[in-house]
């Protein structure tokens, strides 16, 4: 199989792991290609993430490295993450488990699909998110006013420092820190979490992905949208965002770890 290898490059331990993985995969008969940054550190030529064609990707780093890879892939190929970050909710393997994974790797591996969000401003596609889209003011310490519409009906209005719209996968990221629930990733829905709302009655909502979700920014203050902590879009003021289920989900190699046991283990590290 052809394996695409991406590594965090600002951490020597991650690069050491990447070098070992490259050797192990090649010894097992797989072809390994590197992204340009990893290739610049390990030697050899690199292949752009948004142009690569491969059977799978091995991503070594934390959640940020995995999110960045998913963002840049033109076609969503199956990913396995090896944790070299802080917590690594998206990484199913620890470094000491990488060798056993390579030995068991064979064509026909199981794949788990994770829903992504697609964010639109009228006809403009702003981007897709595996974890979340965050709307915040560009002016510190200023609140924004939001209207939430579900299937065209106004369901809530509130003022807050911002709002998160998260996937179930992203429920263990920023949304959890902001007081949102942990959501089973097999559920397909939009998790809305107000950030520091002015009224205590403004609570998180989990909305089916089959519904049309619209977030209207009613404030005159300019705001910005941050997608998966990677890309920032300046929204201006008085704009409307429509959130849909993205056409292509993220794909992860399924190593058959129980989601709730994994979350419990990761949370104990915090």
UniProtKB/Swiss-Prot annotation:
It catalyses: NAD(+) + ATP = ADP + NADP(+) + H(+). Its cofactor is a divalent metal cation. This is NAD kinase. Pfam families: NAD_kinase, NAD_kinase_C. Involved in the regulation of the intracellular balance of NAD and NADP, and is a key enzyme in the biosynthesis of NADP. Catalyzes specifically the phosphorylation on 2'-hydroxyl of the adenosine moiety of NAD to yield NADP. Coiled coil: none annotated. It comes from Methanoregula boonei (strain DSM 21154 / JCM 14090 / 6A8). Its EC number is 2.7.1.23.
